[in-house]
């Protein structure tokens, strides 16, 4: 099965927070992820605290063949620039 890196929404109404997860491509939206690689909180006022990504695990999943969604790829690029 193909593994992808994508966002999984968590949080309250009107206060979105996302997990960056490694998950099977055909899995349902709320299903259990193989691994949580990071977190993204767009509501956080501090830009430095919006993205928390375990770069080592992200690189591992990409190396193994997981394909990142365009949004996750952009967030990873932004996180590595810090």
Swiss-Prot record:
SUPFAM superfamilies: Ribosomal protein S16. Keywords: Ribonucleoprotein, Ribosomal protein. GO terms for molecular function: structural constituent of ribosome. InterPro entries: Ribosomal_bS16 (IPR000307), Ribosomal_bS16_dom_sf (IPR023803). GO terms for cellular component: cytoplasm; small ribosomal subunit. Transmembrane segments: none annotated. GO terms for biological process: translation. Belongs to the bacterial ribosomal protein bS16 family. HAMAP family: Ribosomal_bS16. This is Small ribosomal subunit protein bS16. It comes from Elusimicrobium minutum (strain Pei191). The lineage of its organism: Bacteria, Pseudomonadati, Elusimicrobiota, Elusimicrobia, Elusimicrobiales.
């Amino acid at each position: 099965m193909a593994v992808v890196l994508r966002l999984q929404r968590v949080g309250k109404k009107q206060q979105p927070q996302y997990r960056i997860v490694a998950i099977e491509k055909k899995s349902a939206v709320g299903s259990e992820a193989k691994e949580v690689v990071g977190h993204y909180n767009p509501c956080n006022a501090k830009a430095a605290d919006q993205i928390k990504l375990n770069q080592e695990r992200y690189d591992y999943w990409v190396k193994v063949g997981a394909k990142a969604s365009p949004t996750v790829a952009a967030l990873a690029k932004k996180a590595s620039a810090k």
